[in-house]
Amino acid sequence: MTGDNTLIHSHGINRRDFMKLCAALAATMGLSSKAAAEMAESVTNPQRPPVIWIGAQECTGCTESLLRATHPTVENLVLETISLEYHEVLSAAFGHQVEENKHNALEKYKGQYVLVVDGSIPLKDNGIYCMVAGEPIVDHIRKAAEGAAAIIAIGSCSAWGGVAAAGVNPTGAVSLLSLIHISEPTRP
């Protein structure tokens, strides 16, 4: 075990007991003995997971909620918990540069990043009702979903289609779940 062990030691747990605990947890979950070492490593050397946040037909309410959160604050979240690789609204870059940053993050962290999507996804007329960099947002989301380790639909629009999918639904808005055809959502 390397790294900062102060959290573990502050609770009166020494290295040996901690490794025993990890081994017991791995055995309880039916995992290999190697998993115990991996658990210990991930606890003592936490890495900030890369996050790619794509907004579709949205009001930016989910981003506003994130910015106004008090625990954790957006500063703590972005500087200590996650590595926010792409968020069109919060990015310092714009135009071609922000799209290049997103493309680079998709390639660099393929299979490792968490994809967060807010907003419903318009499918009518080939998705022309929500375009980013000259392409329908649906294409951006499908491409990002292919390489994601995990996908999170944030807010009612992304989770259920929201207001845009209600009633007349002129843009053919759908939820993220409908778009990527996951049969059953996984809840923490």
Q: PLM features: residue spans?
A:
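N-terminal secretory signal peptides
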Residues: 1-13
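Short, conserved loop/helix-junction motifs that constitute active-site signature segments
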Residues: 143-148
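A short alpha->loop->secondary-structure connector
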Residues: 167-179
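N-terminal export signals
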Residues: 17-39
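Extended, subdomain-level signal for the structured scaffold at the beginning of enzyme domains
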Residues: 19, 38-141
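Residue-level detector of conserved catalytic or cofactor/ligand-binding positions
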Residues: 178-188
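Twin-arginine (Tat) signal peptide motif
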Residues: 10-17, 186
